[in-house]
């Protein structure tokens, strides 16, 4: 039976803007209050999907969430008509209005953690939508992400959905951005590597914690997901992210490592006690594991964060053993990073034999590279057929979506534009049409 890795990319929403809402995300902070181009952001994302689809990969999308989040404004004390809510928030708490308008759901690597059916005791694909409690603008995504995933993967014969983990600091969960799966191929059972930044309960075993920026993922959350997903404990590793890396802007593990099948591309300063972590991987691997460790002399952590090298997608083309690195254009523009990539591609000791650079500047300026924009869902033929087909990409759908973006998306968005009530109605009109395009039914709150 064929097994595929479905890439589910987030379709960038109309309210994509730069507000610096994410502590520890250096790009987000550095570009706060800049003018964004939502139309360009969405089209760059669509072009990424088109590129991977035309390479022969299975490609889907997750639609944007309803924004602004009027219910969140209400919870925060802004009452009245939608226009009155927006006006009051803009005048008295513009940073809260910005959070309610956030388009950060486009980074679907944080939407959920997914376990392949070949890894689980009941042979079903398991989903846990992330609670994302570390940031207000991300926390609001959790419930709707769960609703979306339950709609798209609704067949209980194949899919198992779990409740969000408790919305507490002790079970803070950031989704698949802190999860890697290593295996001989997508069809084989794998080693599940969960990465966390802090342990909240019990004895604290680590001498160091990040000082400058917060750690987001807890060990308790990662352990709960592994239990709920019925993963074999002998095939699971929990690794602590290097707190020194977190303080340099590595807010998720997918900013400092990337895995695909039997290849693990990782910076030498990614983990606390990294030698032990890699030894565990080698010990558990019943397949020829290839670990490519990039030294700090080749690329520093700060250079990795600036260019998002490790937030590239590493993919295997159908019916081939070779892999392609899908990297942001910022990697090509940095001589040290490009030299490192050229060396990887030229090295016959690893299966990476080509690189493709993507222009994702609008997302990158907010701290999201190629890997941030996609949620990986391993599916066999039956599981792929059992899911909702309307969000699966082909060139015809991409053409329709491109016209939809050109119709509804602004080419410029400033923070002051969030005060314009017309933006709300533009968003609702667009989402109403999108649900028809993707055959999602009345899935948004305003449609019920």
From Swiss-Prot:
Active site: 174, 252, 372 (nucleophile)
Pathway: Amino-acid degradation; L-arginine degradation via AST pathway; L-glutamate and succinate from L-arginine: step 2/5
EC numbers on record: 3.5.3.23
Pfam families: AstB
Keywords assigned by UniProt, alphabetized: Arginine metabolism, Hydrolase
Xref: InterPro entries: AstB_sf, SuccinylArg_d-Hdrlase_AstB
GO biological process: arginine catabolic process to glutamate; arginine catabolic process to succinate
GO MF: N-succinylarginine dihydrolase activity
Transmembrane region(s): none
Stored PANTHER family: N-SUCCINYLARGININE DIHYDROLASE
Family from the record: Belongs to the succinylarginine dihydrolase family.
Role this protein plays: Catalyzes the hydrolysis of N(2)-succinylarginine into N(2)-succinylornithine, ammonia and CO(2).
NCBIfam families referenced in this protein's UniProt entry, alphabetically: arg_catab_astB, PRK13281.1
Protein known as: N-succinylarginine dihydrolase
């Amino acid at each position: 039976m064929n097994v595929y890795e479905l890439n589910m990319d987030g379709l960038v929403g109309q309210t994509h803007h730069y507000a610096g809402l994410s502590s520890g995300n250096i790009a987000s902070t550095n570009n706060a209050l800049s003018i964004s181009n939502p139309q360009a952001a969405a089209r760059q994302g669509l072009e990424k999907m088109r590129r991977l689809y035309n390479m022969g990969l299975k490609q889907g999308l997750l639609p944007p969430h309803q924004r602004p989040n009027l219910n969140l404004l209400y919870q925060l004390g802004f009452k009245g008509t939608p226009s009155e809510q927006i006006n009051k928030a803009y005048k008295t708490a513009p940073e809260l209005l910005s959070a309610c308008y956030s388009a950060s759901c486009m980074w679907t690597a944080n939407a959920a953690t997914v376990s392949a059916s070949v890894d689980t005791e009941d042979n079903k694909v398991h989903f846990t939508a992330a609670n994302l409690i570390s940031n207000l603008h991300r926390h609001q995504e959790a419930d709707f992400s769960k609703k979306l995933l339950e709609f798209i993967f609704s067949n209980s014969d194949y899919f198992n959905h779990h409740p969000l983990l408790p919305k507490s600091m002790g079970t803070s969960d950031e989704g698949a951005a802190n999860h890697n799966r290593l295996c001989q191929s997508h069809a084989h059972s794998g080693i599940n590597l969960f990465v966390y930044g802090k342990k909240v309960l019990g004895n604290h075993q680590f001498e160091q914690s990040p000082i400058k920026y917060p750690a987001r993922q807890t060990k308790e959350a990662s352990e709960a997901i592994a239990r709920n997903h019925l993963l074999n404990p002998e095939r699971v590793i929990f690794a602590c992210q290097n707190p020194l890396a977190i303080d340099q802007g590595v807010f998720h593990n997918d900013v400092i490592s990337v895995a695909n099948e039997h290849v693990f591309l990782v910076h030498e300063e990614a983990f606390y006690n990294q030698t032990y972590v890699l030894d565990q991987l080698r010990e558990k691997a019943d397949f020829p594991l290839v670990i490519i460790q990039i030294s700090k002399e080749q690329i520093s952590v700060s250079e990795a964060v600036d260019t998002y090298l490790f937030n590239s997608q590493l993919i295997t083309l159908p019916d081939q053993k070779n892999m392609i690195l899908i990297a942001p254009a910022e990697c090509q523009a940095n001589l040290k990073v490009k030299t490192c990539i050229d060396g990887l591609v030229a090295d016959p000791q690893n299966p990476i034999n080509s690189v493709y650079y993507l222009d994702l500047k609008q997302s990158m300026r907010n701290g999201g590279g190629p890997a941030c924009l996609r949620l990986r869902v391993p599916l066999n033929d039956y599981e792929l057929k059992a899911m909702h087909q309307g969000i699966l990409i082909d060139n015809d759908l991409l053409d329709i979506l491109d016209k939809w973006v050109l119709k509804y998306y602004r080419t410029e968005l400033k923070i002051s534009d969030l005060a314009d009530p017309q933006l709300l109605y533009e968003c609702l009109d667009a989402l109403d049409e999108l649900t028809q395009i993707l055959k999602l039914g009345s899935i948004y709150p305003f449609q019920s």
